[in-house]
Regions:
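A structural signal for multi-pass alpha-helical bundles of membrane permease subunits
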Residues: 2-284
């Protein structure tokens, strides 16, 4: 069996590699080339050098979207992981009954599409704002920001909770018992035993939270649409609006340049996070 796998593994890998090439590598290379071009359709693209990148980086809307996205991604990542870990810790207690029901309830929002969630929360938040006499989301950038935070927490906490539960349950019970024998409190056991052994799980959850935060699009489109005056427009929505909503032959190329910058930014931040958290993982 082992010899057969060694002999035929390239054949089994071929469909996956082909799908990856067709679905990612080729489009990325083509998109990278188009970021240096001016075009309406790709068949009439002509090379303009780094002009698209200069105009993208000098676009004030792109700068506003960048800082808004960074603030959103940082805050949502922290809150998602803290809340998800707290819930996971509570649901892995042996004394708690009906944990499977709670896990299902917390996970269910993750199954709802982002566009649907965006419109649902837009209605809920606007009703709340109107009841207290505040401006609606379309005129209230602070409400839009916190609305996106709340929506994202509601959708993603349950998913991260499941991952944290799996991580907590994989910690050998001998470690916990040894800590109790040594007289460690529950808080000390959590910080000195569970957290170090959870670092691989934390690495995964932080990676997912950061990437999800930066590439958020459909919830942003449905909840705020970037209003008011593009102040709640995240990077993905800014790229979309640049490519499809701005009139003029040059904007498609500028939108493509923004997409390349966005991709490089997310990859760089994710790699830094992976390196930082993996260095703290405990070797079993």
């Amino acid at each position: 069996m082992g010899k057969a796998l060694k002999r035929w593994w390239p054949l089994f890998m071929l469909p996956t590699c082909l799908a990856f090439m067709i679905g990612f590598v080729i489009p990325f290379i083509q998109g990278f080339y188009l970021s240096f071009c001016q075009f309406i359709i790709i068949s009439n693209a002509h090379f303009v050098g780094i002009e698209n990148y200069v105009r993208a980086l000098s676009d004030p809307q792109f700068s506003t979207s960048f800082f808004f996205t960074v603030a959103f991604a940082f805050l949502s990542t922290v809150l998602i992981n803290v809340i998800a870990l707290a819930i996971a810790q509570a649901l892995t207690r042996k004394a708690l009954k009906g944990t499977n029901i709670f896990r299902t309830i917390f996970f269910m929002p993750n199954l709802i599409g982002g566009i649907v969630l965006g419109y649902i929360w837009q209605i809920l938040i606007n009703c709340l704002l109107s009841n207290v006499g505040a401006q609606l989301i379309a005129l209230n950038s602070a409400a839009g920001f916190w609305g996106l935070i709340i929506l994202t927490l509601w959708q993603q906490v349950g998913y991260m909770m499941i991952i944290y539960i799996a991580g907590l349950q994989s910690i050998p019970s001998d470690y916990i018992e040894a800590a109790k024998v040594d007289g460690a409190t529950a808080w000390q056991t959590f910080w000195k035993v569970k957290i170090p052994n959870l670092m691989p799980t934390i690495t995964t959850c932080l990676f997912l939270s950061i990437t999800n935060g930066f590439k958020l699009f459909d919830q942003n489109l449905a909840l705020t649409g970037g209003a008011p005056a593009h102040s709640t427009e995240m990077l993905a929505l800014n790229i979309y609006n640049t490519f499809y909503s701005r009139a003029g032959i040059a904007w498609q190329g500028i939108g493509q340049a923004k997409a390349v910058i966005f991709c490089i930014l997310v990859v760089a931040i994710s790699m830094i996070q992976l390196k930082a958290t993996r260095s703290k993982e405990v070797q079993q």
